[in-house]
Amino acid sequence: MSDERVVTPRAGEEDQQIEKSLRPRRLAEFIGQEKVVEQLRIAIAAAKGRGEPLDHTLLYGPPGLGKTSLAGVLANEMEVNIKLTSGPAIERAGDLAALLTNLQKDDILFIDEIHRLNRAIEEVLYPAMEDFALDIMVGKGPGARSLRLKLPRFTVVGATTRLALLTSPLRDRFGSVHRLEFYSVDALYEIVMRSARILGVVCTPEGAREIAARARGTPRIVNRLLRRVRDYAQVIGDGIITLDVARDALAKLEVDHLGLDENDRRLLRAIIDLFGGGPVGLSTLAASLAEEVDAIEDVYEPFLLQLGFLQRTPRGRIATRRAYEHLGVPYVERSVDNGAEQGRLWT
């Protein structure tokens, strides 16, 4: 269900096709993430000055914030090729070996969802990242021997939404680690105006800011909302996205002024109505919503935590006073006994 939401940060097929035309190609075009961009600018200049590949780089943060786009920008700035893959796509050590042996000098290997690499594949990746060498086994049984192949110097750029799931040995092999934060409304406004120009959409500043304010701090969502509002303006209006058109379109999409949709409100109401405001365990909450645990952790929670609507505790999730106020539900202070009782739901 979460992937069908207009405010999901996960990329659908339409997003993947459209995003290619909207992605920035250079750091100068990249909007937001100023600290990360400046750190990468220095790293790129230093690497090019020494004639070396970029340090292995890890990008982490909620989905939809531009990790893949930033990897492409790094390749363009370094003037090298980039090969794209993902943790789940590398099923066997042979898959990784094929990728590594096809890399040219200074190329970038981008691994999305790198936390989903299995341990056997990580063992192959370690010497490749450290020594630019690939250890392969030749033969079987007692006569098997290890053969080391030299690889050209290259850069691994890893992306993950779940930094804590990376093993320490893998995490330690990245010389450059950067967290991508949610975007400000001002930054998202700039993204809307830029995307509107590329898509040939007429959008007033007021309309653009309204879309930006409801995009949950996420560029992928702001671009998706822009396309949905564009459709509404084309069919219902004169094709121009004004403030009123944006508000009407977003109201029909059930995206409120903070960027919450009906699924977010349903999650908060479940905690409040079914579990007395919490604490409630993650697996129990997921079961009550017929959702996957990963979807709640990766898709729902980051923005609700950012808004201060949700609190994580050792005993489970708690809806905050702000969540009650947003839903128009009277807030009742939880007693210690109630918290202890609800704590039994923690898993």
Swiss-Prot record:
CDD domains cross-referenced by the UniProt entry: AAA
Protein residues bound to DNA: 312, 317
Pfam family, one: RuvB_N
UniProt KW keywords: ATP-binding, Cytoplasm, DNA damage, DNA recombination, DNA repair, DNA-binding, Hydrolase, Nucleotide-binding
Binding locations of Mg(2+): 68
Residue ranges of the region described as Head domain (RuvB-H): 257-347
Region of interest: Large ATPase domain (RuvB-L): 1-183
GO cellular component: cytoplasm; Holliday junction resolvase complex
UniProt keyword annotation of DNA damage present: yes
Binding site for ATP: 22-23, 64, 67-69, 130-132, 173, 183, 220
Lyase in keyword set: no
Source organism superkingdom: Bacteria
Secretion signal span: none
Cell compartment(s), UniProt: Cytoplasm
GO biological process: DNA recombination; DNA repair
One Gene Ontology term of the molecular function aspect: four-way junction DNA binding
Record's catalysed reaction(s): ATP + H2O = ADP + phosphate + H(+)
Region called Small ATPAse domain (RuvB-S), residue ranges: 184-254
Subunit and interaction comment: Homohexamer. Forms an RuvA(8)-RuvB(12)-Holliday junction (HJ) complex. HJ DNA is sandwiched between 2 RuvA tetramers; dsDNA enters through RuvA and exits via RuvB. An RuvB hexamer assembles on each DNA strand where it exits the tetramer. Each RuvB hexamer is contacted by two RuvA subunits (via domain III) on 2 adjacent RuvB subunits; this complex drives branch migration. In the full resolvosome a probable DNA-RuvA(4)-RuvB(12)-RuvC(2) complex forms which resolves the HJ.
Family: Belongs to the RuvB family.
PANTHER family: HOLLIDAY JUNCTION BRANCH MIGRATION COMPLEX SUBUNIT RUVB (PTHR42848:SF1), PTHR42848
Notes on the domains: Has 3 domains, the large (RuvB-L) and small ATPase (RuvB-S) domains and the C-terminal head (RuvB-H) domain. The head domain binds DNA, while the ATPase domains jointly bind ATP, ADP or are empty depending on the state of the subunit in the translocation cycle. During a single DNA translocation step the structure of each domain remains the same, but their relative positions change.
Function: The RuvA-RuvB-RuvC complex processes Holliday junction (HJ) DNA during genetic recombination and DNA repair, while the RuvA-RuvB complex plays an important role in the rescue of blocked DNA replication forks via replication fork reversal (RFR). RuvA specifically binds to HJ cruciform DNA, conferring on it an open structure. The RuvB hexamer acts as an ATP-dependent pump, pulling dsDNA into and through the RuvAB complex. RuvB forms 2 homohexamers on either side of HJ DNA bound by 1 or 2 RuvA tetramers; 4 subunits per hexamer contact DNA at a time.
Protein name per its UniProtKB record: Holliday junction branch migration complex subunit RuvB
Organism: Roseiflexus castenholzii (strain DSM 13941 / HLO8)
Gene this chain is encoded by: ruvB
